[in-house]
Amino acid sequence: MASTKRRLNREESSVVLGEEQVAELKEAFELFDKDRTGFIKKDALKTTCKQFGVFVMEDQLDAMFAEADTTKSGAIGFPEFMSMMSRRMKQTSNEQILMNAFKTFDPEGNGYILTKDLSKALTTLGDKLTEAELQELLSISENEQKQVKYDLFVNTLFSKK
């Protein structure tokens, strides 16, 4: 599974941020740097993420912070914060693109797509998966009715575990 996730997440680089986004991130960082040390702690990070529409689970937050806190000091400065948020914003964007693509295969709007439709799309369109990669993904996401709940599928693809 890890190799498939790496392949699907291979663009780990940060999003190029515009001046306005950098200014917004700086403003948010300063807002949560209450003691004006130039650093924020993990508890302030969750609030900052929500402000930017980046919703994360606690374990994801722990992983994001651990990755950004390269000095293991328990706090991150603005450059680390900006890099981390940029990567997360890119991931969120990619997740949304994939969710929207899956919705086209869900005419009933019930959150499920047929395994055969997903298989065809992932092995014939765009950056094609191999049969082995496809089977690896389906093994964790297919239900008894030969359907895939696509929000769970997308979350699995983009999780860092």
Swiss-Prot record:
Per the record, a Pfam family? EF-hand_7
GO MF annotations, alphabetized: ATPase regulator activity; calcium ion binding; cytoskeletal motor activator activity; myosin heavy chain binding
What PROSITE patterns does the database record attribute to this sequence?
Answer: EF_HAND_2
Query: Which positions carry Phosphoserine?
Result: S13, S14
GO biological process, alphabetically ordered: mitotic cytokinesis; myosin filament assembly; myosin II filament organization; response to differentiation-inducing factor 1; sorocarp development
Give a yes or no for keyword Cell division in this entry: no
Which InterPro entries does this chain map to?
Answer: EF-hand-dom_pair, EF_hand_dom, Myosin_RLC
> Mind listing the UniProt keywords for this protein, alphabetically?
Motor protein, Myosin, Phosphoprotein, Repeat
Domain EF-hand: residue ranges = 20-55, 56-91, 93-128
Any one Gene Ontology cellular component term annotated for this protein: myosin II complex
Phosphoprotein as a keyword of this entry, yes or no, is yes
Q: How does it assemble?
A: Myosin is a hexamer of 2 heavy chains and 4 light chains (two regulatory light chains and two essential light chains).
Additional free-text comment from the UniProt record: The sequences of all three RMLC calcium-binding domains have diverged significantly from that of calmodulin. Therefore, it seems unlikely that these light chains bind calcium. It is potential that phosphorylation has taken over the role of calcium-binding in the regulation of Dictyostelium myosin.
Q: What is this protein called?
A: Myosin regulatory light chain
The protein's organism comes out as: Dictyostelium discoideum (Social amoeba)
